[in-house]
Curated annotation (Swiss-Prot):
Database matches in Pfam families: ThrE, ThrE_2
Keywords: Cell membrane, Membrane, Transmembrane, Transmembrane helix
UniProt lineage: Eukaryota, Fungi, Dikarya, Ascomycota, Taphrinomycotina
Similarity-based family: Belongs to the ThrE exporter (TC 2.A.79) family.
Composition-biased stretches (Polar residues): 10-27, 200-210
Subcellular location: Cell membrane; Cell tip
PANTHER family per record: DUF1212 FAMILY PROTEIN, PHEROMONE-REGULATED MEMBRANE PROTEIN 10
Transmembrane residue ranges: 505-525, 529-549, 551-571, 584-604, 622-642, 659-679, 691-711, 715-735, 740-760, 802-822
InterPro entries in UniProt: ThrE-like_N, ThrE/Ser_Exporter, ThrE_2
Annotated Gene Ontology cellular component terms: cell division site; cell tip; plasma membrane
GO molecular function: amino acid transmembrane transporter activity
Protein name: Uncharacterized protein C16A10.01
Length: 830
């Protein structure tokens, strides 16, 4: 760790007239993006008040390299020394006025600086005080005051460097001198710079001639620093010689009260890094073990760390900073049960950050929506980019990053192309786009200074609702001139570097919960079937989460292999009988196990693409969904046939007995459980859970009662999707956010219902029965006319019919909502 202090008078505003007022907007300069976690050197610039040094106003640059992680073996009895910097005058009135103005320093920081920083109490206080005037300046705005809080451990070195390229004290003032003081809670360690009041060596001529000798670095070794805890002072001469005229650096170290980082302060650091970091952050530095030491964790925090790979509030940190609000689901519990005393740092910074990122705290409704996480686009309206200052390369890079992120996290293709067209118009980049599944061709037309370029973006899509919302919000901010294209690209890089929100074992476990909870509701299973359904679903989750990503060859045949295994085990359990009656339902077990890998979402996106006149992408997706369904049907057939060859008395029932059916009143509990498991599998943030569960439950209620009247699956799916689409469109109108992530879980709830109504597993079971029959010789491609309804091809057509009904319902909802609220194409579903 090193802290370097240098005087830099080469500033445009360093000479001012006595009658001029201090330049408020130049008090603190924002440094460029950097990584605090990677221990980069960050710089804070403080402007000295006009009354301190007469007519001159040099800049003091404070550079610090701070170890982000604290030592794990630290004890409460260990003394910690914290250093922050303040400028005071050494005249006779210092002792009287500094005490009066130090109490007002925190208020002055908030009033004079509209940045994401604030004063940090007795642990870290940055102020500029003088005998006549005072300006309070905040610490490093980009680091959130952490760059000016170094720690003096025994294994670190403390450097002090004062370098001058010209004489800043040539005004002839003999009654004032500058003092740079480091304050602490207990015995204050000080770092003071005291130039001589009158000296021939401080003339501009002599200082230029001694420019090569004005840099001096002194270090404390571990022995001297450990013995200086009682308050010993160290004095170093600026020019390397001990004279009365040469400026000196005086450092006195003292003990301070023990202080340990609380969870909130660590979360603030993570949020600040995620917001401003320009490079991909190290995933290992963003784990719970780094921010909540085991010795200080409470039971609740340890328990939550088993389920989430990082704190949920930090994960959504690049867009919002509601630290001190009671609506955060995980962070509040973690902070509350860590057995730490909140410091001034964690109690003051959140308010300043919240005041900056919210548009107007006077509007209770908007503040409530912001705090609940439904809309994270309320920022300071005074900040706009009216002219795009980003270069051509940066704008192109942003468009490609947005395209890649949207494709990666499962955004619908028509939404991707529409967003890219809007971006090309606002960013003044004429471009043409051609989308194919998992591939986007971007052609930038020729401009005056640039030649035409063609880019191909190819990624494998996955469903991540949390990061889908984050990418959409970043895109909206850039399009509304809240962020520049360069800053938007940096935040997108941070988002893509994040690990999944939930741990792998939890995702695999929720596969089992989803299978068990959907069995009685959709497929007619009983309570006994739920246990076996959980085991089969857990097996699917293990293969999908652990085995599939690690073996490339297995990935190519994942659907066939897993359907064979599940069908084999399902028929084995279904063949268990008691008193000549089956104990378990074979059809419910198999259909419930493969629920989460049904291609309903793929077909739904294909139908939306066909409706948006994207014939190529829509046709490819529809064909892929049919082939995918054939894979599942083939696997079910092979698995059932394999067990049929082993057990001649294997069950042939493709439906469940009505006597084992669960009462419909239990659906009130089982549908929310199934929806919650879907939200965790799709990596949805807890802030999104309430509205997503509400929409999904409403959609199923409408589907359930409509199916009692109409019976046909296509009509019931269309009516249920109509209700879901209306709720999603109203959400996008009032909340001003994309509704696709809200209605997507409802689609996953509607697809299994229609799939069961069409008898999805009956095709494979019927073919398997024909294969194992003693009197019939057939194969999987031989289908008679009377059995055409149960053919393998019907399995794929079933998914197409369901998806068409859902898509028609969404289109009808858009047409219905339009007369009442207008058409907001950038937010609505279609």
């Amino acid at each position: 760790m090193g802290v370097q202090l240098k005087l830099d008078p080469n500033s445009k505003n360093w000479l001012r007239q006595p009658d001029q007022q201090p330049i408020q907007d130049s008090i603190c300069t924002l440094p460029g993006p950097g990584s605090l976690l990677k221990k980069k050197i960050r710089k804070t610039e403080f402007r000295i008040d006009n009354g301190l040094l007469g007519n001159t106003s040099p800049i003091i640059n404070v550079e610090s390299k701070i170890p982000f992680h604290r030592r794990a073996n630290s004890t409460p009895e260990e003394s910690r020394k914290r250093v922050s910097f303040s400028l005071t005058s050494n005249d006779g009135a210092k002792s009287d006025r500094s005490s009066q103005k130090s109490s007002n320093s925190r208020k002055s920081i908030r009033s004079q600086s509209r940045s994401r920083s604030s004063s940090v109490g007795s642990d870290s206080q940055a102020s500029i005080q003088s005998g006549t005037n005072s300006e309070v300046v905040s610490d490093d705005e980009e680091d959130g005051n952490f760059a000016s809080i170094p720690e003096l451990h025994e294994d670190n070195e403390y450097h002090s460097n004062l370098a001058t390229s010209s004489n800043p004290f040539s005004d002839g003032s003999s009654s004032k001198s500058a003092s740079l003081t480091a304050s602490s809670a207990a015995a204050s360690p000080t770092v003071s710079f005291s130039p001589a009041s009158t000296s021939e060596n401080l003339t501009p001529t002599s200082s230029k001639s001694l420019a090569s000798n004005t840099s001096l670095v002194q270090s404390f070794n571990s022995a001297s620093r450990s013995s200086s805890i009682s308050g010993n002072q160290y004095t170093y001469n600026l020019l390397g010689k001990s004279t009365d005229e040469s400026p000196k650096i005086t450092i006195s170290a003292g003990t301070s009260m023990s202080h340990f980082p609380s969870a909130s302060s660590k979360l603030i650091q993570m949020r600040r890094h995620a917001h401003m970091n320009s490079e991909k952050c190290d995933p290992e530095l963003l784990s719970h073990n780094e921010y909540f030491p085991m010795m200080k964790r409470g039971f609740i925090s340890r328990f939550l760390c088993l389920f989430v790979s990082r704190d949920a509030n930090v994960y959504i940190g690049p867009l919002e900073s509601s630290h001190a609000k009671p609506y955060r689901p995980f962070g509040s519990f973690v902070s509350r049960f860590t057995n730490r005393v909140a410091s001034d740092l964690e109690s003051q910074i959140p308010d300043a950050l919240e005041a900056v990122l919210t548009q107007n705290n006077d509007y209770d409704f908007n503040s409530f929506l912001h705090n609940m996480g439904y809309s994270r686009c309320y920022v300071d309206e005074n900040y706009h980019i009216t002219i795009h200052v980003s270069s051509y390369e940066r704008r192109v890079e942003f468009m490609l990053a947005v395209c890649e992120a949207m494709m990666l996290y499962g955004s619908p293709s028509h939404k991707i192309q529409q967003s890219l067209r809007i971006a090309s118009r606002i960013l003044q980049l004429p471009a043409t786009f051609l989308y194919l599944p998992d591939c986007m061709f971007v052609y930038f037309k020729k401009l005056e200074q640039y030649s035409p370029d063609v880019f191909v973006v190819r990624v494998t899509s996955q469903t991540d609702l949390n990061r889908m919302v984050l990418v959409n919000e970043i895109f909206r901010r850039v399009m509304r001139d809240k962020l520049s294209a360069e800053d938007g690209t940096e935040v997108l890089r941070n988002i893509t570097s994040f690990r999944p929100l939930y741990r792998d074992w939890l995702v695999a476990f929720m596969h089992g919960v989803a299978s068990a909870s959907i069995l009685p509701v959709v497929y007619g299973g009983g309570w006994r079937d739920m246990l076996i359904g959980f085991v089969l679903g857990l097996l699917l989750g293990i293969f999908r989460v652990y085995i599939n990503p690690r073996f490339f060859l297995f990935d190519s045949l994942f659907e066939v292999i897993i359907s064979i295994i599940l069908s084999f085990l399902g028929r084995a359990f279904g063949s268990i009988s008691r008193y000549d009656k089956p104990v378990f339902c074979f059809a419910a077990l198999v259909e419930g196990a493969i629920t989460l890998i049904l291609p309903g979402y793929v077909v739904f996106c294909g139908v939306l693409e066909l409706q948006s006149k994207n014939i190529v992408a829509g046709g490819v997706r529809m064909l892929y969904a049919v082939i995918f369904s054939l894979f599942l049907s083939f696997g079910i057939t092979i698995g059932s046939a394999l067990y049929g060859w082993m057990d001649k008395d294997a069950t042939d029932a493709d439906t469940c007995m009505s006597i084992i059916a669960v009462s419909p009143y239990w659906y009130i509990l089982l549908i929310p459980i199934f929806t919650l498991s879907l939200l965790i599998v799709t990596q949805s943030h807890p802030r999104q859970w309430p509205i997503q569960m509400f929409v999904a439950c409403c959609g199923y209620v409408v589907y359930y009662f409509s199916s009692l009247h109409f019976g046909a699956s296509q009509i019931s799916s269309a009516i249920g999707s109509f209700a879901v689409g209306c709720l999603g469109n109203m959400y996008s109108h009032f909340i001003k956010s994309s509704s696709f992530a809200v209605v997507l879980p409802a689609i996953f709830v509607l697809v299994p219902s229609g799939f069961a109504a069409q008898g999805g597993v009956s095709a494979g079971l019927d073919t398997a029965s024909q294969i194992t029959s003693k009197n019939t010789t057939t194969n999987t491609t031989t289908v008679t006319t009377e059995n055409s309804q149960n053919s393998s091809l019907e399995f794929g057509f079933t998914m197409v019919e369901i998806a068409i009904g859902i898509a028609i319902g969404f289109l009808a909802s858009s047409l219905t909502v339009y007369p009442f609220f207008g058409y907001r194409r950038k937010n609505m579903m279609l």
